């Protein structure tokens, strides 16, 4: 039984990245499709505003907190928080420690020219890969093609690397289509692991500053997310603290 901590309407798995990777790896490849989500501050704010999107996250088999900032703010607010297990860390652990010799993974998203470096860096067998077109989630035929690819290319690990909320919508549709395996909604994690995009230094990650590293590299795209939208998680945490009525011991 996976321990959970309820936070902002989601039952988060209270696992380290190592424990989360082991739990994911323990699922048989032929099991009915289930998916993992990795909400960060931006996701949690959007979920509070969009009940339909929140339902997709609640439908995930495993919900992992992807934000040390949210964890720290939650503790300051007196709200119990789960352990942090970032999507990038869990993905790296799966590729490095939980693949069988010659085992192939399925990837939906990620640029095709990044695949050789990803495979070379991590000793992967050639992945089964589908790169849907931009805006595929608004094109019924393209969306259906992505779902069909997941069904036609079963794997123990199916990495959905098309960004939130597209990957969560896709994961729910793949589950409804009767696929098998475990889907991982992991955003840019594979791009980091392929060396196509640099990840923040370890000390910045440990101090909850990965967002600042990414903002400095791409301010035009990320300024609104990190400076305007994500801070809205603070009143959500304070509201949760008030609803619970008393301080909870943080981790």
Where are each of the predicted segments found?
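Proline-aspartate-enriched helix->loop->beta-strand connector
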Residues: 150-164, 180
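N-terminal nucleotide/polyanion-binding subdomain common to many enzyme families
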Residues: 1-91
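A transmembrane-helix-recognition feature enriched in membrane-embedded lipid enzymes
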Residues: 71-76, 200-251
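Conserved beta-alpha
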Residues: 71-154
């Amino acid at each position: 039984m996976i321990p959970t901590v309820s936070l902002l309407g989601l039952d988060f798995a209270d696992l380290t990245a190592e424990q989360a990777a082991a739990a994911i790896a323990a699922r048989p490849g032929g099991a009915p499709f289930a998916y993992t989500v990795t909400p960060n501050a931006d996701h949690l704010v959007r979920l509070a505003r969009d009940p339909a999107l929140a339902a997709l996250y609640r439908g995930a088999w495993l919900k992992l907190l992807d934000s040390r900032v949210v964890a720290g703010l939650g503790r300051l607010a007196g709200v119990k928080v789960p352990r942090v297990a970032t999507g990038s860390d869990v993905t790296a652990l799966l590729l490095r420690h939980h693949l069988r010799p010659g085992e192939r993974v399925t990837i939906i998203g990620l640029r095709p020219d990044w695949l050789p470096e990803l495979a070379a860096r991590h000793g992967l067998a050639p992945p089964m890969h589908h790169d849907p077109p931009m805006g595929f989630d608004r094109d019924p035929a393209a969306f259906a093609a992505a779902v069909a690819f997941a069904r036609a290319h079963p794997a123990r690990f199916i990495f959905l690397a098309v960004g939130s909320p597209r990957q969560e919508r896709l994961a729910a549709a793949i589950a409804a289509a009767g696929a098998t395996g475990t889907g991982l909604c992991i955003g840019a994690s594979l791009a980091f692991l392929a060396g196509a995009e640099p990840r923040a230094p370890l000390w910045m990650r440990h101090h909850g500053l990965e967002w600042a590293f990414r903002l400095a590299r791409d301010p035009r795209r990320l300024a609104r997310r990190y400076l305007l939208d994500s801070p809205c998680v603070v009143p959500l945490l304070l509201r949760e603290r008030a609803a619970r009525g008393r301080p909870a011991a943080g981790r």
